[in-house]
């Protein structure tokens, strides 16, 4: 009886330590790829809706103590100036859910020396993005500024089939397009609907960065 209780207590301690380890990793997480999109293609409810999505799924993963922002750019509209993705994500450094640093600063993030790739750009749950869903919405150029050619899918508020476009990056740094190894500006999407994004290797995912 005593031996059984000792064994059970030991197992409980191991589980508790493991749980604390996972919790600590989630608390230090400051970067992730969304494990789910809006389900409405590139219509994310604008940048505000995308930020809310980041915050909600981060909170569900135990990292809601941080302020999260979507890595998205938007064109000037309704009296508001254009927004560059690089200007809205804080200063860094940024770590994934496992504590691996993907970039130290904004400059490092947008350089060839960053550590963002298919093995490190994990979801908030710690999973890797499937290769056939590697297109990540950004609406940005490689330097983190707004894409050329107009508002990205109505500033991420439209999901019209076959109309409009938003730049996407390849999270695994491979594939086709004009710049297949770019994590944030590989090519433009072929429309803004969910079907359009899926057809070219995406699923409406985007990057989330903690600003603090």
What does each model-identified segment do?
Residues 12-13, 32:
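Charged/polar interaction segments and conserved charged motifs
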Residues 22-212:
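Secreted/extracellular ectodomain signature
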Residues 14-22:
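C-terminal segment of classical bacterial N-terminal signal peptides
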């Amino acid at each position: 009886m005593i031996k059984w209780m000792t064994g059970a207590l030991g197992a409980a301690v191991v589980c508790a330590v493991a749980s604390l380890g996972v919790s600590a990793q989630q608390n230090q997480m400051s970067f992730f790829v969304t494990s789910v999109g809006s389900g409405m293609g590139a219509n994310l409810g604008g940048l505000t809706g995308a930020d809310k999505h980041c915050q909600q799924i981060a909170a569900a993963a135990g990292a809601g103590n941080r302020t999260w922002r979507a890595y998205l750019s938007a064109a000037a509209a309704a009296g508001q100036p254009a927004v560059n993705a690089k200007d809205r994500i804080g200063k860094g450094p940024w770590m994934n859910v496992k504590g691996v640093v993907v970039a130290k600063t904004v400059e490092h993030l947008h350089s060839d020396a960053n550590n963002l790739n298919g093995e490190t750009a994990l979801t908030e749950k710690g999973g890797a993005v499937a290769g056939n869903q590697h297109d990540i919405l950004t609406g940005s150029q490689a330097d983190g500024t707004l894409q050329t050619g107009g508002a990205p899918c109505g500033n991420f508020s439209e999901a019209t089939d076959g109309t409009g476009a938003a730049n996407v990056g390849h999270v695994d740094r491979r594939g086709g397009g004009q710049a297949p190894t770019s994590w944030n500006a590989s090519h433009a999407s072929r429309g803004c609907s969910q079907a359009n994004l899926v057809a070219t290797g995406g699923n409406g995912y985007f990057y989330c960065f903690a600003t603090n």
